[in-house]
Amino acid sequence: MKVVIAAAGTGGHINPGIAIANKIKSEQPDSEIIFIGTDRGLENDLVPKAGYGIKHIGAYGVYRKPTIENLKRLIKTIHSISEAKTILKEFKPDLVIGTGGYITLSVCRAAQKLQIPYIIHESNVLPGIATKLMSKKAKYVMLGFKEAKYKLNPKVNTVVTGTPSNTKCLNLTTEQKDEKIKELGLNSKLPIILVFGGSQGAKSINTAVEDLVIKENNYQIIWAPGKKNFEEIKEYLFEKGKDIENIKNARILP
């Protein structure tokens, strides 16, 4: 089986795509899988590391605000449908899978024009515009949350799958675990909470956590607020009299 996976931009779109690809490979080792993305996003790092090839198209996210820049993005995205068609004609996939976001609109629209079956995976509770537009002709729309079903047309063929992930478990001895905790400068005798808002971070999570790390707690926090938020949080903590590199019960990682 030959499969094209459309995934671009953030880890929230790309990692589920990679997890789907890995599952297909585990079930059908002879399958051929390529990704379609842009030349700008995390896909250019994550997809090759996972062992898959990637092709690029010039798709962009389009905002609702009417500006010249937005018009340029729209024109490029419309043109990217033709670029996607060229890739699909060359690769001749049996199935196209979109993981949401602007890339799904371009690639699934191209698949639709070429009469190639496509499915969509939507990880969010609130489906994006691309998912809403392309869901009506999709073979299936797989949902991360059952609530998302009620935001789509009732005629859409949905199935709740949850969000696929690449699970990797480490079997550490107590001594190894304590050593890793020590490397982080934390106390192995206190509970440790991991706070992670995805590759871009999550503003609501960061807002809730930033004051917690200042307090003296009977637990410890490992916090990954996202690269784009790191400097802002560093400044906020500095204003509160805290050095981000030297908070007793917290380790904050970009």
Describe the predicted segments one by one.
Residues 3-8, 27-76, 161, 227-229:
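Conserved nucleotide-sugar phosphate-binding/catalytic loop shared by glycosyltransferases and other
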Residues 13-24:
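Short amphipathic alpha-helix
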Residues 28, 86-92, 186-188:
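Glycine-rich phosphate-binding loop signature in dinucleotide/nucleotide-binding domains
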Residues 32, 53, 112-178, 186:
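Active-site-proximal region of nucleotide-activated glycan assembly enzymes
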Residues 41, 46, 50, 175-182, ...:
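Donor-nucleotide binding loops and adjacent catalytic segments primarily
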Residues 72-87, 176-179, 253-254:
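Glycine-rich, highly charged phosphate/nucleotide-binding loops
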Residues 83-96, 104-119, 132-140:
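Glycosyltransferases and closely related glycan-assembly transferases
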